[in-house]
């Protein structure tokens, strides 16, 4: 007959398996992770209709090397409700000075480089302290070669300049970049033909007006520069071998 009496002398053995015990922190983190994943799935489902639309990327931030060439820095006075011409691209002497600096001093072009795009960048800063206004800008790319732009125009449907006070224009024509090779030989043979036939055949000549939304006459410091987007081709084989290269 079995003995059901309680006696502490009778030993009992218990086997504990670790698979039934989990870290409390891991349990809470896993629950939060599952909740976050479920919320993320719901949020993505609400954005699925946007897959039918396309967004244009900024070519300025694309692949390639940016080479900046500052054209000029000067101060302009702009009256209220008007915009002043700051870039007109007229005169061969302006071309000569600009592109001589571009070729010889500040732009190391070699034959295996390709100019993909040219950006005109206008940086605007107020010269007087404690002024609160926004900059306005308008530009044109396609115009008659004989067109003479006005120095001052009225403000009609302008573009607001961003928070960094920088107005950037891509001068590339529709259809892609500018496959220019052997730039040194083209430039040395005839400078005028190089500008007219090589550069302006592939890029637009811009006309840019700058203004403000201020009710008073404002003094603006302008920095106008060209930024060249250069494509560099990787060599087929390295020129040097060894741990230093």
Curated annotation (Swiss-Prot):
Effect of residue 85 to F: Prevents crystallization of occlusion bodies
Pfam families found in the cross-reference section: Polyhedrin (PF00738)
InterPro entries: Polyhedrin (IPR001746)
Cellular localization per UniProt: Host nucleus
Record note on what altering residue 183 to F does: Prevents the occlusion of virus particles
Keyword Repressor: no
One cellular component (GO) term of this entry: host cell nuclear matrix
Protein origin, superkingdom: Viruses
Main location as per UniProt: host cell
Alphabetically ordered keywords of this record: Host nucleus, Viral occlusion body
Record note on what altering residue 25 to D does: Forms a single large polyhedron
Protein task: Major component of the virus occlusion bodies which are large proteinaceous structures termed polyhedra. These structures serve as the protective package for the virus particles outside the infected host and allow natural transmission of virus between insect hosts, assisting persistence in the environment. Forms the paracrystalline lattice of polyhedra and interacts with enveloped virions as well as other accessory molecules and structures to form a mature viral occlusion body.
Name of the protein in question: Polyhedrin
Record organism: Autographa californica nuclear polyhedrosis virus
GN (gene name): PH
């Amino acid at each position: 007959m079995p003995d059901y009496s309680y006696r502490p002398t009778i030993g009992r053995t218990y086997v504990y398996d670790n698979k039934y015990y989990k870290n409390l922190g891991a349990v809470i983190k896993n629950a939060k992770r599952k909740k976050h994943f479920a919320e993320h799935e719901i949020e993505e489902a609400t954005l699925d209709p946007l897959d039918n639309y396309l967004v244009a990327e900024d070519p300025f931030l694309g692949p390639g090397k940016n080479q900046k060439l500052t054209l000029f820095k000067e101060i302009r006075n702009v009256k209220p409700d008007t915009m002043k011409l700051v870039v007109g691209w007229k005169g061969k002497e302006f071309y000569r000075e600009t592109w001589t600096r571009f070729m010889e001093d500040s732009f190391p072009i070699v034959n295996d480089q390709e100019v993909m795009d040219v950006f005109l960048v206008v940086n605007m800063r107020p010269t007087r302290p404690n002024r609160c206004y926004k900059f306005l800008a308008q530009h044109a790319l396609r115009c008659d070669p004989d067109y003479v732009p006005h120095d001052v125009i009225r403000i009609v449907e302008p573009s607001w300049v961003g928070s960094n006070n920088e107005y950037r224009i891509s001068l590339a024509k529709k259809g892609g970049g500018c496959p220019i090779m052997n730039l040194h030989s083209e430039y040395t043979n005839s400078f005028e033909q190089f500008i007219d036939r090589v550069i302006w055949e592939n890029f637009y000549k811009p006309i840019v007006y700058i203004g403000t939304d201020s009710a008073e006459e404002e003094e603006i410091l302008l920095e106008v520069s060209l930024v060249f987007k250069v494509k560099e081709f990787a060599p087929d084989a390295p020129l040097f071998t060894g741990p230093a290269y």
